[in-house]
Amino acid sequence: MAEDFVIEMLHITKEFPGIKANDDITLQLRKGEVHALLGENGAGKSTLMSVLFGLYQPEAGQIRKNGKEVAIRNPNDANALGIGMVHQHFKLVECFSVLDNIILGVEPNKMGFLQKAEARKKVMALSEKYGLRVDPDALVSDISVGMQQRVEILKMLYRDNEILIFDEPTAVLTPQEIDELMEIMRGFKKEGKSILFITHKLNEIMAVADRCTVLRKGKYMGTVDIKDTTKEELSRMMVGRDVQLQVEKQPAKPGAVVLDVQNVTMHSDQRKKDSVKDVTFQVHAGEIVCLAGIEGNGQTEFVYGLTGLEKLANGKITLDGKDITHATIRQRSKDGMSHIPEDRHKHGLVLDYSLENNMVLQRYWQPEFQKGGFIRSDKVREYSDRLIAQYDVRSGQGSSTIVRSMSGGNQQKAIIAREIDRDPKLLIAVQPTRGLDVGAIEYIHKQIVAERDKGTAVLLVSLELDEVMNLADRILVMYEGEVVGEFDPKTTTVQELGLYMAGARKQGKETK
């Protein structure tokens, strides 16, 4: 019966130029349930929630609240109906205080005067009630990412929202913060609030959701009760085939030192402090060393220094016995360094180039692709076609496809094909599976392990602890620019890593 559902999205269709992001999708949310929305990258999850929150208008379909059809033209309409949303990328004003962010747009006033004391009282009461402790006077720019998420949740609660949308809420949290968020969601559920939870993490769905709706390529695949399903079944619904969720790999056989990093320090002019502090470690041939940590703790800057995108303030980098501290990016590439960058659009691809031109970005100047100073298009096409076939890169027009038109997963496959085919001595893979579906993740993990088994030294930088534990032979944790601990994945736990990632421990000692 319709009255069983607090929200119904019936036969929703939303189109963008050239793509049907939502194709006749129905989603029904019960009062007091946690309902997960699962799908691969580009399946239409965020689009569907943006329709519910009033950011997009659908071409077809209707939305009902408590059985009555409603029109949601913008986020103000959504808020008026008790619908709130925590976006994947937080919508906070960094130079405002926590309190100012929470009340922004709904400031209480009397006779035209802001009643901040009244607002503070309500915020602190909500903070206490739900265990979302925050400092209302702290600037958002000075608080952690986990704390910023609490501010976003309090923004919803301050507006008395009863239907709460969380878009990939755990992407930037430590394991402990993820556990806290799950408890907060369970608390909301007990209160009778209804939660829509967008995620691609099957463990979290199994832990907290009551039901799960699965989307694939913009279409509705079905809704299942979590108590009656498995992770394997959900992944099969999501990608249309069986997926290997665990990485199968033999124990590492480390060889000679390939990467030697000694006392590397980098300075951030923006923050006016050191972003990387005296980092020293080695990576051997035939092993995967993972640099783990919460986003914003110096990993990005360190990789920039390692790959030549930024200069070091101090320290030395040696690649296979050769000092490359001051080498150019091209020289590092010639010396055997391959780099799968964190931001595939900014540093990995030229989006308006064809796929074949992107495939030779690291090689176009080599003799095999040149004749008399001109690039040989036939050789470029031949090389690109081979990589496309070998690495299963799917695109509309093959080698001539403009890269911008390709899916995120296939863009990433193209980068991996280009970087691995160069037969590197060192492969630096930075968040190689970020934003990808389980099928693409499975493929990329297999490629990284295969490189290790060929004798390549692999430095993996990842925020995903499941990925870290699955792939790494050794784990280094970075906190505030320092390596604060080294671990063997066989003898550590996600919880222990989380303590080091949050700065609670350093080199085996408790910190304050």
Where are these regions (language model features)?
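Glycine-rich phosphate-binding loops of nucleotide-dependent enzymes
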Residues: 2-512
